[in-house]
Amino acid sequence: MGIVIGIDVGGSTTKIVGVEDKKIKNPMFVKATDPVTSLFGAFGKYIYDNNISLSNIEKVILTGVGSAYIDQPLYGLPTAKTDEFLANGLGAQYNTGLDSLLVVSMGTGTSFVKVQGSTIEHIGGLGIGGGTILGLSKLLLKTHDFHQIASLAEHGSLNDIDLHIRDITPHPLPGLPLDVTASIFGKADAN
């Protein structure tokens, strides 16, 4: 048996991992401006960094929205596609060892996948995720560089920007302590 390469070609980031003998090998994240460049860049970097030859790869499995742009085998290797929600559910089940769980996958957006035994079902999602952070940061901070955004966030305080229960009442509400957020960015006009 060779190495199975799994690649999630997302809306903003491509994730790649190898699996050999049921063991996960060195997950990697790669960003690029388009899905095809991101996919081939991630694949090349992954096999180079991990000293994997094409002859040692048993199969490549693609998922994610960007996989729709790929309609031929990668480098002549057996290549298949799988549903992203199924992959998220099976991956979470494998990593946790749990039979029933709710998987929250935050990528460009956020999806919710219900797992009960062998039944895996996408039950909804939000248009809020990493893409929201990058878009807001571009508009407000004039940058979409994730490392710069993270550095700025480390030096900020949510108490300066988010409205908390304590900001609107001196008494806790049933089930809501004073330090719970009442409104994200609720103090933005005051700062």
Language-model features: locations:
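Short glycine-rich, Thr/Ser-proximal phosphate-binding strand/loop in the N-terminal lobe
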Residues: 3-41, 45, 120
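Conserved phosphate-binding catalytic cores of ATP/NTP-utilizing and phosphoryl-transfer enzymes
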Residues: 70-104, 108-119
